[in-house]
From Swiss-Prot:
GO terms for molecular function: hydrolase activity, acting on carbon-nitrogen (but not peptide) bonds, in linear amidines; N4-acetylcytidine amidohydrolase activity. It catalyses: N(4)-acetylcytidine + H2O = cytidine + acetate + H(+); N(4)-acetyl-2'-deoxycytidine + H2O = 2'-deoxycytidine + acetate + H(+); N(4)-acetylcytosine + H2O = cytosine + acetate + H(+). CDD domains: ASCH_yqfb_like. This is N(4)-acetylcytidine amidohydrolase. One of its GO terms (cellular component) is cytosol. Residues 6-102 form the ASCH domain. It comes from Edwardsiella ictaluri (strain 93-146). SMART domains: ASCH. PANTHER family: UCP029143 FAMILY PROTEIN. The active site is at K20, T23, E73.
Length: 107
């Protein structure tokens, strides 16, 4: 089964434990809707590992990222800004996708 959204493998444990409850994406992934259930896979190999439900999608400027966003990503604000800069260089307008874990998949 092809995932609807992917995350780097390093984030899998935090998602499954409920420590990571948002993801910050660019315009290409801003189309998700509240209530939508997504199959989640690892970015590296596409292997599905859970299902999440989208709670909301909110636009945010890179400069507006704050400590609350960092806590929801389970990292420091400096680490969050660094990761976002690596993944989305030169992009200022982003989208916060908040989600909850529906179920983990047997692996």
């Amino acid at each position: 089964m092809k995932p609807d959204i992917t995350f780097y493998r390093r984030f899998q444990a935090d998602i499954l434990a409920g420590r990571k409850t948002i993801t910050i994406r660019d315009d290409s992934e801003s189309h998700f809707q509240p209530g939508q259930r997504l199959m989640v896979g690892q970015y590296e190999d596409g292997r599905p590992f859970c299902e999440i439900e989208v709670i909301g999608v909110t636009p945010v400027m890179l400069a507006q990222l704050n400590a609350q966003h960092a806590a929801q990503e389970n990292m420091t604000l400096d680490a969050l800004r660094s990761v976002i800069g690596e993944i989305y260089p030169q992009i200022e307008r982003l989208y916060v996708i908040s989600f909850s874990l529906v179920r983990a998949l047997a692996g």
